[in-house]
UniProtKB/Swiss-Prot annotation:
Its EC number is 2.7.7.27. GO terms for molecular function: ATP binding; glucose-1-phosphate adenylyltransferase activity. NCBIfam families: glgC, PRK05293.1. GO terms for biological process: glycogen biosynthetic process. Belongs to the bacterial/plant glucose-1-phosphate adenylyltransferase family. PROSITE patterns: ADP_GLC_PYROPHOSPH_1, ADP_GLC_PYROPHOSPH_2, ADP_GLC_PYROPHOSPH_3. The gene is glgC. PANTHER family: GLUCOSE-1-PHOSPHATE ADENYLYLTRANSFERASE (PTHR43523:SF2), GLUCOSE-1-PHOSPHATE ADENYLYLTRANSFERASE-RELATED (PTHR43523). It comes from Streptococcus pneumoniae (strain CGSP14). This is Glucose-1-phosphate adenylyltransferase. Alpha-D-glucose 1-phosphate binds at residues 164, 179-180, 190.
Length: 380
């Protein structure tokens, strides 16, 4: 039976710009917003868009990501006609090969894709924060009779040189693609979200592999090749909130925007929920000295200090006399007595010892997973 569309989430990136936060886990597994991991947004968008089959392509440090996704039940992807598959590099008769790029990762999983037998494939990045109805994008793809549709976001002209830019005609057909141009001709930036007719893409990838023609990356190789061949390639304009959280600064900004009064992500919209693995935790405890304002405090936290405009993830502790301002404290992290944290991201399980000060006024500071800053006490 042919399935209409299969989603493939590219989640194998190392995320070196996130420094200590990705030394032991893949970037899509990094926590966000107190309760979620970054990949939850792509998975939830799939679930909310009615996509029942999802492949998650992993490579770098996949254990935490695999454990988080499990059988996909948190996103309703564990039914008879639905499922989530973890796709990792494997040894074949011709030898071992790591994924060499985004499109090469798809080529390496052709057998899996063929087993699902989709008419279309939706290619997603697992490390962006946004809400999007992929079904609406698919309808646009069909209406345009496109071979490829690229989701684009209008960005300020001064920032356009950081992105792959799509130049389009009056009907939004893409006539030129420029990778990070010094003098951009438009402000339509690729979001790294693509819908392909599967058989067309399959044929191209197989032919490129046989002829040893480099076709490892969608932005650098596949899109330019489609345009060169005269394929119908269209832009799908997206106007909602979207954030690439590939740096410490952007991850911190996205978390702060998440708790802002405006909340552009519209996280409280019950019609488009973001789902995640539900870990059962005890209620929060606020001690006699606790002072919390303008903050998001998730289940299982212990607070006996001051928390302002910050996020405390599951099981975080802020002990007596400690102050946390404009910061993200990830799960299980401990902020010791009298410690002061400002504009920082404290990784899962980290310990900030009593009296330690971390000031990110000039540059957002980061403490890695299970890292100890200062001298830990027996209580920690």
């Amino acid at each position: 039976m042919k399935n209409e569309m299969l989603a493939l989430i590219l989640a194998g990136g190392q995320g070196t710009r996130l420094a200590k936060l990705t030394q032991s886990i893949a970037k899509p597994a990094v926590q966000f917003g107190g309760r979620y991991r970054i990949i939850d947004f792509a998975l939830s968008n799939c679930a909310n868009s009615g996509i029942h089959n999802v492949g998650v392509v992993t490579q770098y440090q996949p254990l935490a990501l695999n454990n988080h996704i499990g059988n996909g039940s948190s996103w309703g992807l564990d039914g008879i006609d639905s499922g989530v598959s973890i796709l990792q590099p494997y040894s074949a008769s011709e030898g071992n090969r790591w994924f060499e790029g985004t499109s090469h990762a798809i080529y390496q999983n052709i057998d899996y894709i063929d087993s699902v037998n989709p008419e279309y494939v939706l290619i997603l990045s697992g490390d962006h924060i946004y809400k999007m109805d992929y079904d609406d994008m698919l309808q646009s793809h069909k209406d345009n009779n496109a071979s490829l549709t690229v989701a684009v976001l209008d960005v300020p002209l001064k920032e356009a040189s950081r992105f792959g830019i799509m130049n389009t005609d009056a009907n939004n057909r893409i006539v030129e693609f420029e990778e990070k141009p010094a003098q951009p001709k438009s402000t339509k930036a690729s979001m790294g979200i693509y819908i392909f007719d599967w058989q067309r893409l399959r044929n191209m990838l197989v032919a490129a592999e046989k002829s040893k023609v480099g076709m490892s990356d969608f932005g650098k190789n596949v899109i330019p090749n489609y345009l060169e061949l005269g394929e119908s390639v269209y832009a799908y304009e997206f106007s909602g909130y979207w954030k690439d959280v590939g740096t410490i600064e952007s991850l911190w900004e996205a978390n702060m925007e998440y708790i802002s009064p405006e909340n552009a992500l519209d996280s409280r919209n019950r019609q488009w929920k973001i789902y995640s693995r539900n870990l059962i935790s005890p209620p929060n405890f606020l001690g006699a000295n606790a002072h919390v304002e303008d903050s998001l405090v998730v289940d299982g936290c212990f607070v006996d200090g001051t928390v302002k405009h910050s996020i405390l993830s599951t099981g975080a502790q802020v002990r007596e006399g400690a102050e946390v301002l404009d910061s993200v404290i990830m799960s299980g992290a401990i902020i010791g007595q009298g410690a002061k944290i400002k504009r920082a991201i404290i990784g899962e399980g980290a310990i900030i010892s009593d009296g330690v000060e971390i000031d990110g006024t000039d540059e957002v500071q980061v403490v890695g997973y299970n890292e100890v800053v200062g001298v830990a006490t027996d209580e920690d």
